[in-house]
Amino acid sequence: MTCRTRFAPSPTGYLHIGGARTALYCWLEARHRGGQFVLRIEDTDRERSTQAAIDAILEAMDWLGLGYDEGPIYQTQRIARYQEVAEQLLAQGKAYYAYETREELDAMREAAMAKQEKPRFNGAAREQNLPYRDDPNRVIRFKNPIGGTVVFEDLIKGCIEIANSELDDMVIFRPDGFPTYNFAVVVDDWDMGITEVIRGDDHINNTPRQINIYEALGAPVPRFAHMPMILDEQGAKLSKRTGAADVMQYKDAGYLPHALINYLARLGWSHGDQELFTRQELLDLFDVKDVNSKAARLDMAKLGWVNQHYLKTDDPASIAPQLEYQLAKLGVDIAAGPAAADVVVALRERVQTLKEMAEKAVVWYQPLETYDEAAVMKHLKLGAEVPLGKARELLAAVDAWSVENVSAALHDAAAALELGMGKIAQPLRVAITGTQVSPDISQTVYLAGREGALKRIDAALIKIGAA
């Protein structure tokens, strides 16, 4: 049987980091087993579902590179199908109409709690075979088996058993004519031929209810894999403040999509001690049965380390568009400075994120207006005009502006003055960047461009008072 998995988010908000990991594991399992991956949008919550959230989910999936074979499929476009299946269950005596008011349901709940019992529907209408009538309280309830136990082998958690006596006759169609989650998801997974349902372990209690519906329909029951949640660095439930952010906020924070994929893959799954994986290695090695049954903790330092690895090792040309995105966010005119790929080469050993890289790179795209006063006092004092002047002279004479030719000119300047490179580099670094910290001096000067470098040296000479 062909493996078919699905990712089925509700568009009531952004795609957060836990949802992204679920999508990744579903995608990896399908790809690893040569199957198909389906994207379904569970948008039947009409009050909370928004088009903006749908767009955000699709954008995040695209950014992460999690392509789907089918979809997006929208539940709101399948209402007639849910009604058809509900009517089938009614005709077979496996579901029934119920008309209890909110007050009657509240009274049932209070009576159960008074007896220290689990609040539940008492099944009063179960055998009454009430006909359809136009009533604002009308629902359709599923006849859950009264006896026996639901047993399933979870691919991550192992054997799980829940007695049917713990379950009541749940609503499968609401008064507004829309299906409930537990019913719609079964019909969808049945129709779509889903063979593996991979989701968070907050759905474990839904699973026995869903299995009973599958069996009532005579539908094949998929295999289930319930992943533990992701905790924050203190071991508490994730919040927006501690990492449960929109996936696209990780893009805005300067993380590479494949770095986030690598990190999320390891957040609950492992292959020996290996930390870094190519996408192909993940496809070859991933098996949902190897996912840890214990909750994983988010580790932002680890994510930073993974991201820096890819910043250091990826082709600079592939990183350049993402650096340009960060520069544009800072209001930088990209055309006013060096090629982004050259900036990547210069800065990637010094940063963990593209946001940091962009912030450091601004100096090459905008006029230098401020200087670190401590750097000026130390390196742009009287006497510095000599190495700066010689460097300017030889840089102005460079034929083809390149890192190599800039480096040669600076070494020639140092040799002509019989100075160590530090005596040339430090005043030049302050002249070009306004600070005493920058990448290799040849790269620093090269990125300023010939005209920009000469202008900045001239400004520094004026500052020294030796122009």
From Swiss-Prot:
Q: Which residues bind ATP?
A: 240
Which GO CC terms are listed, alphabetically? cytosol
Going by the UniProt record, its keywords in alphabetical order are: Aminoacyl-tRNA synthetase, ATP-binding, Cytoplasm, Ligase, Nucleotide-binding, Protein biosynthesis
Against InterPro entries, the record matches this protein to:
aa-tRNA-synth_I_cd-bd, aa-tRNA-synth_I_codon-bd_sub2, aa-tRNA-synth_I_CS, aa_tRNA-synth_I_cd-bd_sf, Glu-tRNA-ligase_bac/mito, Glu/Gln-tRNA-synth, Glu/Gln-tRNA-synth_Ib_cat-dom, GluQ/Sye
What is the main EC category here? Answer: ligase
Alphabetized GO MF terms = ATP binding; glutamate-tRNA ligase activity; tRNA binding; zinc ion binding
The answer to whether keyword Glycosyltransferase applies is: no
Q: What is its main location?
A: cytoplasm
- Reaction catalysis annotation: tRNA(Glu) + L-glutamate + ATP = L-glutamyl-tRNA(Glu) + AMP + diphosphate
> Which cell locations does it reside in?
Cytoplasm
Gene Ontology biological-process annotations: glutamyl-tRNA aminoacylation
- Renumbered ranges of motif 'HIGH' region: 9-19
Task: Answer yes or no on keyword Ligase.
Answer: yes
- What's its EC? 6.1.1.17
What residue intervals hold the motif 'KMSKS' region? 237-241
Give the Pfam families listed for this entry: Anticodon_2, tRNA-synt_1c
Q: Which CDD domains match?
A: GluRS_core (cd00808)
Q: What does this protein do?
A: Catalyzes the attachment of glutamate to tRNA(Glu) in a two-step reaction: glutamate is first activated by ATP to form Glu-AMP and then transferred to the acceptor end of tRNA(Glu).
UniProt similarity note: Belongs to the class-I aminoacyl-tRNA synthetase family. Glutamate--tRNA ligase type 1 subfamily.
On subunit structure and binding partners, the annotation says: Monomer.
Q: What is this protein called?
A: Glutamate--tRNA ligase
Q: What organism does the record attribute this protein to?
A: Xanthomonas euvesicatoria pv. vesicatoria (strain 85-10)
